[in-house]
């Protein structure tokens, strides 16, 4: 075996591994399990990014739905779930037939398991607000994050917003539908849905553009008309937890929740009327075993649910010490594979 050949293999494998992070910082998909990928079951080159809301729905870009072909939701544990329905905002195009409010929603038949939650924000945003965009663009199987800053609203079409992405971390194909997320009151909140990127031909500076949640809030509440909540939650060592949920109802609602092997001991959800897009909390207590918090008959938060290995991904492993940076195969196993290949060729 010649050393130069082995060196070339090592170099090529390192390059392949680094490709998974060239568009941003790799993040642990299992820790951001409300981010999902929308796939075409027969063409793996067609995909978009989406965010789970309200148990079995996901919000994404309208053109991901309109262009057709995406019929599978891929979860963080690599499970593939068929889509059961799709919607596009009624104002997807304007009076001139141009693409306008580029937001869509898809659903699956049953609620899926996820702990991480990003709430929907309909507030006006300020210039230079730090934000992140997490998507699968350019990597497919690993989730990456681009750090950005909110730039401005379109001068005429106020529903379109822009973000400065910089040169080192920027969006690319496959990031369509990703959430633009800010940190607000200790929560991650989505202010817009990613639609695409722009490059200034004079300065070569990159920017991203998206559609605000504020501009499609009626579409969201008409489609969902329910609670936005994590479907999984755990109690602490004392058997207690505080769970934050958000109303995506069409009208004001009041608390109707109850527990099975879970006791509601307080929280702001008990205080009265809850308006659309407002958040509230439930304080719960349990004996540490599995139970359920029922927001309604069909909207359930599983408490202390055992993690089941579905045979894909991390099998629900929430350990953040993984060294494979989002699912990329480690260098040494790949190198050994290359050595074995060379031996076969000799």
Which sequence ranges carry the predicted segments?
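C-terminal subregion of chymotrypsin/trypsin-like serine protease catalytic domains
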Residues: 53, 58, 177, 181-251, ...
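Chymotrypsin/trypsin-fold serine protease catalytic domain
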Residues: 100-168, 206, 210-214
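Conserved catalytic-core segment of clan PA serine endopeptidases
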Residues: 20-31, 41-44, 69-114
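Beta-strand-enriched, solvent-exposed domains that form extended recognition/catalytic surfaces
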Residues: 230-323
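A cross-kingdom C-terminal cell-surface attachment/processing module
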Residues: 330-346
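Gram-negative bacterial Sec-dependent N-terminal signal peptides
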Residues: 1-20, 335-340
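A conserved glycine-rich beta-strand in the N-terminal activation segment of trypsin-fold
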Residues: 35-55, 177
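Acidic glycine-/aspartate-rich tracts in secreted/extracellular proteins
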Residues: 43, 63-67, 109-114, 136-140, ...
């Amino acid at each position: 075996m010649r050393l130069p050949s082995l060196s070339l293999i090592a170099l090529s494998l390192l390059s392949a591994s680094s490709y998974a992070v060239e568009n941003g910082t790799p993040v642990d998909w299992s820790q951001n399990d409300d981010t999902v990928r929308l796939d075409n079951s027969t063409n793996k080159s067609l995909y978009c990014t989406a965010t789970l809301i309200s148990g079995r729905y996901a919000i994404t870009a309208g053109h991901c739905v309109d262009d057709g072909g995406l019929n599978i939701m891929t979860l963080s544990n690599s499970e593939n779930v068929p889509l059961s329905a799709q919607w596009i905002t009624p104002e997807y195009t304007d009076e001139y037939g141009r693409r306008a409010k580029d937001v869509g929603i898809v659903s699956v038949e049953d609620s899926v398991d996820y702990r991480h939650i990003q709430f929907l924000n309909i507030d006006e945003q300020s210039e230079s607000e730090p934000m992140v965009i997490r998507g699968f663009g350019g990597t497919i199987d690993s989730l990456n994050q681009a750090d950005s800053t909110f730039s401005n609203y379109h001068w005429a079409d106020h529903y379109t917003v822009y973000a400065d992405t910089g040169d080192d971390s920027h969006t690319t194909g496959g990031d369509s539908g990703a959430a633009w997320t800010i940190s607000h009151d200790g929560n991650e909140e989505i202010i817009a849905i990613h639609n695409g990127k722009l490059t200034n031909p004079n300065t070569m500076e990159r920017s991203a553009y998206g559609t605000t949640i504020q501009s499609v809030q009626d579409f969201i509440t008409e489609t969902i008309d329910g609670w936005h909540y994590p479907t999984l939650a755990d109690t602490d060592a004392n058997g207690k937890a505080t769970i934050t949920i958000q109303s995506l109802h069409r009208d004001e609602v009041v608390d109707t929740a109850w527990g099975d092997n879970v006791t509601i001991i307080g929280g702001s959800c008990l205080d009265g009327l809850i308006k659309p897009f407002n958040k509230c909390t439930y304080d719960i207590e349990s004996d540490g075993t599995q139970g359920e918090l029922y927001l309604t008959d069909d909207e359930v938060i599983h408490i202390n649910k055992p993690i089941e290995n579905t045979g894909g991904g991390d099998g629900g492993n929430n350990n953040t010490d993984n060294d494979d940076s989002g699912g990329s195969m480690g260098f040494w196993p790949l190198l050994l594979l290359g050595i074995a290949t060379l031996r076969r060729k000799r």
